[in-house]
Structures are given as structure tokens and as C-alpha cells.
Design a protein with these regions (language model features):
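Catalytic phosphate-handling regions of large nucleic-acid enzymes and associated NTPases
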Residues: 1-167, 216-218
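Charged, surface-exposed alpha-helical interface/stalk elements
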Residues: 136-225
Length: 225
């Protein structure tokens, strides 16, 4: 209610609530930098955030880092939307670092789709500083895909080429350890593979398939010979 009132948002609060919850999530695979503090159940890796509590039971506020990224000094120079004579939110924000690279973005639009993988904020900052110092491109630090708290591996299996325009592809692997001949302990899942979904997948593998009618008939034939 407060946010929609002061931002001139007229499209219903359901999508607004979902956006706020998503910006506060901090489990592995959500945000590298969550701009809001999650006070309550904002979702976990069990269901990829779908297990967040109802909006009326959770609370949030700006995180400590948010105002360091979206500088207060910029407020006076931003262009603001005029909503029926009331100045509301800015037409766009100007963060100190590109947040689309920090937290990534995935979705569809009219005639296009996007899938930007998250990257390491510290490497992004180092790269920006190198650009400001006019360091040659070859001497600038690399920016690698990064998911805060992820213990698995991320490997580039199709390096991007500036000349051919090929897209980079990354293979994300979890980790496991063999503890016995018939026992494996999974210690990390690939990002985007949520715990409950993977548990359901494993349980299906453990199910003994029911014998088909054809197999039953074959068994009867062998027994009668």
C-alpha cells in the first residue's frame, strides 16, 4: 500500500509484492546483493523462493548496501515521473554499479527474451575502476559468473567471441561424495535445481516400475512350459 501510493503504481499489488519479495531474497541462487532486508520467511532453496510466507506476515526495509549503490547525492539530479501533478518515482535509477550484472535477469518480453547470469560484484567494481583508469581491454580484470554462497563449479563450455558474436555457455555442477558402495551424499545442487524438486526426482528413481500386462503374459507362458 505505502509503496504503490508513493510510486504512482496502478497495476495491482500482487506483482508489486512479488517484486519486493524477490529483491529481498538472499538464499543461494537468488541475489548476490539483496537490496531489501528479509525480515521473515522470504523463501529458501527448498522451493526456489516459492515457499515465501504471505505478504502480510513478512516485513522489509532497505539493506545497508542499497544507499551505497543508489547514492543519495544523485536524488536531486534524477528525472522524476509526474503522476497527476505528484512527483513519484524516478524515470530510471543510476546505481554506482550495474545491478543487472550483479544479480542477473531472466524473463520474456514482446518478441524477445533475456537471460543474464549473475556475476561477482567485486570483479565488476574492479573492472569499472580499470575502465575509469583507461586501462587497455586486455589488461582489465575478468568478470566471472558468480552465485553468492554456491559451493559447486561453474565452467565456460563455449567461450564468448567478440568477432563471431557467439554466446557464452556455462556448465554449473553441484558436488557429491561417495560414502559407501551404494550410498552417495549430495553436498551441493546446481543453481536453479531446488531441493524439493530434486528430492522428488530421486524418489521417482527409487520406485520399482510396475510390470506391464505384456510382461505378465510372458511370465505365465514360461511357467506353463
Amino acid at each position: 500500500g505505502y509503496v504503490s501510493e508513493h510510486s504512482g503504481y496502478h497495476h495491482g499489488e500482487a506483482s508489486l509484492n512479488a517484486a519486493i519479495v524477490g529483491m529481498a531474497q538472499n538464499f543461494v541462487g537468488s541475489n548476490n546483493i539483496n537490496l531489501f532486508e528479509p525480515n521473515g520467511q522470504f523463501g529458501t532453496r527448498l522451493k526456489g523462493g516459492e515457499d515465501s510466507a504471505s505478504e502480510r506476515y513478512i516485513f522489509t526495509q532497505l539493506s545497508r548496501l542499497t544507499r551505497l549503490i543508489f547514492r543519495q547525492e544523485d536524488d536531486a539530479v534524477l528525472s522524476y515521473i509526474n503522476d497527476d501533478g505528484q512527483l513519484v518515482e524516478p524515470m530510471y535509477y543510476a546505481p554506482a554499479i550495474p545491478m543487472i550484472l550483479v544479480n542477473g535477469s531472466k524473463g520474456i518480453g514482446t518478441g524477445f527474451s533475456t537471460d543474464v547470469i549473475p556475476h561477482n560484484p567485486l570483479q565488476i567494481i574492479a573492472y569499472i575502476r580499470a575502465m575509469l583508469m583507461e586501462t587497455s581491454v586486455g589488461d582489465r580484470p575478468t568478470i566471472e559468473p558468480y552465485f553468492k554462497g554456491f559451493k559447486g563449479t561453474i565452467r565456460n563450455i563455449a567461450a564468448a567471441s567478440a568477432t563471431s558474436g557467439a554466446s557464452a555457455k556455462y556448465l554449473i555442477k553441484g558436488t557429491y561424495e561417495i560414502v559407501a558402495d551404494r550410498k552417495v551424499r549430495i553436498t551441493e545442487l546446481p543453481v536453479g535445481t531446488w531441493t524439493d524438486d530434486y528430492k522428488e526426482f530421486l524418489e521417482k528413481l527409487m520406485e520399482v516400475p510396475a510390470a506391464s500386462e505384456k510382461d505378465k503374459d510372458k511370465g505365465k507362458g514360461k511357467g506353463g512350459d
